[in-house]
Regions:
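C-terminal nucleotide
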Residues: 71-226
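Gly/Ser-rich oxyanion-binding loop with an adjacent helix/lid
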Residues: 1-88, 221-225
């Protein structure tokens, strides 16, 4: 039997964890544990997309399958570049804690699917398939015209992507340099951008339930700038 401490439906990638363990078991039974972890992640993503009907990306599956702290470049979705980031949080006298806010992501498939769909809508405006292919300066130079598509949330989500991709590189650089204070600053900036621009903290269709928002507010009150 399989047992897990991953909370179901709480946004902690419980489905990716399940897919990974099944893939790893099959790798052990029939392939002497030789199946590449990234391939296991891709198989898990396919299963979730096709058989479960959730249009998830590959990030959660890679995190579960490869393990540790990783940096991923999805430019070539068939061959994502995955690098492990060697860091020991205890060295910096920090622990990563998971707070159970009692929220659920179980019925948010449509909300989740809207994020890449809206970003692709912005990319299509510039005749590109993916937003990462759009020149950032060209986007901001034409932001008034882009708003004419009638979806300001898509515009805000595009702003998040442009800044977040740069933040990821800076976060990895900060960890490699041992600058944990800079890493924390960048992580907080990432969270703030997710809240304001990506808007993935609560569902606009259910504004009365904001358990993650409450968790963030209380964490900020307890931790302050620490």
């Amino acid at each position: 039997f399989i047992t897990s401490d991953v909370i179901m439906g709480a946004g902690l990638s419980s489905s990716a964890a399940f897919e990974t363990i099944i893939g790893t078991i099959l790798s052990g039974l029939y392939n002497d544990m030789t199946v590449d972890p990234v391939l296991i992640a891709q198989i898990g993503q396919y299963a979730e997309n096709v058989y479960f009907g959730k249009p998830c990306g590959l990030m959660d599956q890679c995190a579960s399958s490869v393990g540790s702290l990783i940096n991923i470049d999805f430019k070539d979705i068939d061959k994502p570049v995955v690098r492990k980031v060697d860091v020991d949080f205890s060295k910096f006298e920090h622990s990563l804690c998971i707070v159970d806010t009692k929220g659920s992501h179980a019925d948010l498939t449509d909300e989740y699917a809207a994020i890449p769909a809206e970003m692709k809508k912005i990319a299509n405006y510039f005749n590109k398939e993916f937003l990462r292919e759009v020149d950032e300066q060209e986007f901001f130079d034409n932001i008034a015209k882009v708003r004419e598509i009638g979806n300001d949330r898509a515009v805000l989500r595009a702003i998040h992507l442009f800044t977040e991709n740069k933040r990821v590189d800076l976060q990895v650089a900060a960890l490699n340099a041992g600058d944990f204070d800079e890493f924390k600053r960048l992580i907080k900036a990432s969270g703030d951008s997710s809240y304001k621009f990506l808007q993935n903290v609560y569902a606009n269709s259910d504004v009365f339930n904001q358990s993650v928002s409450i968790g963030l507010a209380m964490s900020e009150k307890i931790l302050g700038d620490n």
